């Protein structure tokens, strides 16, 4: 009695016969048109658009946006507020930091439609060349930048950090998270760790923040 393996073996004749059958079927009427139809991709779907109402730098703005649009792209491409920078576009550098209802976020990681009715503050809304925010003035005084690309995000984040400390929001650097945080050099550096400066102006940034916070420069926890 033949084994199962022997029963499953194909002869050369059977392989050739199978190939001929396949060729014949593909040559049948309508086969080529069916293949072409299957190979043609369906037309792209139009984007889903939504109306997004925001308050940006104190002004009400209404945008018709693809629901996939990030807050960063809404600000830069639709509202032309290019002070907010696109760095890594993956939430790892902090260049796109803006304030949403007073809280700092990475605008590249957030969809604009998630912020219906929110108040957005960008670097343009913090101050102007003729009326600088205290943090902007301190960055200039202490050379808290070199190329300047990360500076808008650094300043927005720095403003939010001092507000967090003032409100008593704890951080990982605190030995006792139940204690009220202090605006020390180490505390501020820890909170600013998500904002990268490839030029290495970190010490100057910390000095600028210390001045605005009203603490002795260089004081450590």
Regions found by a protein language model. Give the residues of each.
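Signature of N-terminal electron-transfer/Fe-S-associated modules in redox systems
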Residues: 2-221
């Amino acid at each position: 009695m033949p084994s199962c393996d022997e029963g499953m073996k194909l002869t050369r004749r059977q392989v050739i016969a199978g190939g001929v059958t396949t060729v014949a079927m593909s040559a049948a009427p309508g086969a080529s048109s069916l293949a072409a139809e299957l190979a043609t991709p369906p037309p792209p779907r139009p984007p889903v658009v939504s109306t997004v109402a925001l308050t940006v730098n104190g002004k009400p703005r209404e945008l018709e946006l693809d629901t996939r649009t990030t807050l960063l792209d809404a600000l830069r491409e639709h509202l032309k507020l290019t002070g907010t920078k696109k760095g890594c576009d993956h939430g790892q550098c902090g260049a796109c930091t803006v304030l949403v209802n007073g809280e700092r976020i990475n605008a590249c990681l957030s969809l604009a439609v998630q912020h219906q009715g929110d108040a957005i503050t960008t670097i343009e809304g913090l101050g102007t060349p003729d009326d600088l925010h205290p943090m902007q003035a301190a960055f200039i005084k202490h050379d808290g930048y070199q190329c300047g690309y990360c500076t808008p995000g650094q300043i927005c984040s720095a403003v939010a950090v001092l507000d967090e400390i003032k409100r008593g929001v704890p951080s990982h650097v605190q030995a006792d998270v139940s204690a009220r945080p202090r605006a020390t050099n180490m505390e501020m550096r820890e909170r600013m760790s998500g904002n990268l400066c490839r030029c290495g102006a970190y010490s100057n940034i910390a000095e600028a923040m210390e001045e605005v916070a009203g603490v002795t420069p260089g004081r450590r926890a």
